[in-house]
């Protein structure tokens, strides 16, 4: 354990639900998304009429919103922020990573993340990312089930550089 983590006050943040700055525009990436205009609206819960849990409702919390809250968090004694996934994904929880090299545009830009880290550090706060590197979403540049990415995904070809990342029972239709 790093010495700076011993005795730390850690605050976990689910970025979409933490604070909306109003600085990050909502890009149109998926026709099935629901954007909650009112911060106090109830989030969607449970499966839809087909029994599928979509995780497709967004409240617009973003990285600049987190940065705006840093003085408040520092005042609480927080010295470590644990951020749930921030990489591009299709769900609000972002555990279905689409691209590990891109900050989800719903949360902001790489520059927004850089500013957040610099501002946090200036207040004595460290940032820990929840890096989900043991799985991706099926709609990712690595699996590319729907063909939305330019890269050759494991679902599309056994020649994909990412093919070995996945376990197929019967390629391509059956996978774990």
Segments predicted by a language model, with ranges:
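Extended acidic/polar, glycine-enriched regions
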Residues: 1-3
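Substrate-binding/active-site clefts of carbohydrate-active enzymes
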Residues: 15-79, 86-114, 118-176
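Mature N-terminal segment immediately following signal peptide/propeptide cleavage
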Residues: 9-14
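A short, structural micro-pattern
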Residues: 5-7, 94
